[in-house]
Amino acid sequence: MRGLLIAFEGIDGSGKSSQAVLLKDWIEMRRDVYLTEWNSSEWIHDIIKEAKKKNMLTSITFSLIHATDFSDRYERYILPMLKSGFVVICDRYVYTAYARDVVRNVDFDWVKRLYSFAIKPNFTFYIRVTPEIALERIRKAKRKIKPQEAGIDILGEIPLEEGFLKYQSRIVEIYDKIAKEESNFITIDGNRPLKDVQIDIRKILGEYIDNSL
């Protein structure tokens, strides 16, 4: 049985995490599946969280510490699961690092080299929404905007909602550029209801997953 690597990308509030979970639940009825999230390495997660809280990361340190998290999960979980024939779903992949690091003025080619060890996903679903829609969803969920979601480390101390719109707009610009360059990127209109987005994703994957059993 062949392993399959699926990644979800998008700005905060895009609904990509919800789509990843919905897809996992659907695939579980067909074959083994594993879901991994960005910044979820057991031994470095708390370090990253504390460093962000204290706003003590330079642009390069920001890049390297997230690469450490990814490489740990990649070697201990992602690759072994793929070799065992699992469908591996990544809630954020290396493209998150590309976008967030470049926004912080880290050289794009340098970041790509940093993650050059990582294989390309079979499918990367870019759940594209406007920052305004993402912000409205966060409001409806009554969730507080995290300082890092508002880019306070690069924009300074401005109102969180204002920072969110500015920062996420920059992220969208980079994602759009990546989507044009990466052949495995599938741009999905995420401004629609979650159910409609998930239907489109399943239509794309259904036959491929069944044929890879």
From Swiss-Prot:
EC number(s) reported in the record: 2.7.4.9
One biological process term in Gene Ontology: dTDP biosynthetic process
Keyword Kinase on entry: yes
GO terms assigned for molecular function: ATP binding; dTMP kinase activity
GO cellular component: cytoplasm
Enzymatic class: transferase
Catalyses which reaction(s): dTMP + ATP = dTDP + ADP
Residues given in the record as ATP binding sites: G10, I11, D12, G13, S14, G15, K16, S17
InterPro entries noted in UniProt: P-loop_NTPase, Thymidylate_kin-like_dom, Thymidylate_kinase
Keywords, comma-separated and alphabetical: ATP-binding, Kinase, Nucleotide biosynthesis, Nucleotide-binding, Transferase
NCBIfam families: DTMP_kinase
Annotated HAMAP family: Thymidylate_kinase
Protein name in UniProt: Probable thymidylate kinase 2
Origin species: Saccharolobus solfataricus (strain ATCC 35092 / DSM 1617 / JCM 11322 / P2) (Sulfolobus solfataricus)
